[in-house]
Curated annotation (Swiss-Prot):
Pathway: Carbohydrate biosynthesis; 3-deoxy-D-manno-octulosonate biosynthesis; 3-deoxy-D-manno-octulosonate from D-ribulose 5-phosphate: step 2/3; Bacterial outer membrane biogenesis; lipopolysaccharide biosynthesis. Its EC number is 2.5.1.55. It is found in: Cytoplasm. GO terms for cellular component: cytoplasm. The lineage of its organism: Bacteria, Pseudomonadati, Campylobacterota, Epsilonproteobacteria, Campylobacterales. SUPFAM superfamilies: Aldolase. It comes from Campylobacter jejuni subsp. doylei (strain ATCC BAA-1458 / RM4099 / 269.97). Gene3D superfamilies: Aldolase class I. One of its GO terms (biological process) is keto-3-deoxy-D-manno-octulosonic acid biosynthetic process. This is 2-dehydro-3-deoxyphosphooctonate aldolase. Keywords: Cytoplasm, Lipopolysaccharide biosynthesis, Transferase. The keyword Cytoplasm applies. It is an enzyme of class 2 (transferase).
Amino acid sequence: MKKMILIAGPCVIESKDLIFKVAKQLKNFNENPNIEFYFKSSFDKANRTSINSFRGPGLEEGLKILQSVKDEFGMKILTDIHESNQANPVSEVADVLQIPAFLCRQTDLLVAAAKTKAKVNIKKGQFLNPSDIKYSVKKVLQTRGIEDEGYEAAQKNGVFVAERGASFGYGNLVVDMRSLVIMREFAPVIFDATHSVQMPGAAGGSSGGKSEFVEPLARAAAAVGIDGFFFETHINPCEALCDGPNMLDLTRLKNCVNTLLEIQNII
């Protein structure tokens, strides 16, 4: 059976203690031979709705904490970058550089990520036609000297894309499952099940969300046939400092992932 990519962890690095508690509970996924696991957390949430919102510990301290997760648990790391000058230092720790959805067309950022040895996960913007993600993929591939296009070229050269919902009026997102099929023509596809149920800005200065839809949408995406899943998860989402309303409670993740593996095995 083909390995399923699983990206999971808290939205933002709230503290080293929390990160280690979550990583400890995720280590079974890292040891599962059917899963290609990446621990995810952000050192800086640079696009929070309000200037008063918690952003994280910053680059230097954040990378130290992520490196300690790597050392302690043997996990691969995924984290996002927001500026081109972050690509090189972050790639010294992270195995995957994530391009945020709002920045998925930023050429300088994509090129900077492509010039590192890290894999690159491009999150499709909420505003973007799914077929247009191919141009972002091509920016990475061509920077790496790859003229070939398509799924195999992207897979071979460490580029994948993530679906995280499309804007549906103000303060709401919907998932068009057709986008998973369309984007998979250009690169391996990850379904970001937690951000797909986000309600941007709906909580008055912060984003809301409908976490009860995380698992049903993930199952639907698995049935379409994709390469992996992205879950932001927390010990207590109600107390999370970022994206709590759309995060999956850590106690629900194991059963959810097992179900996705079963669906993947069937199709």
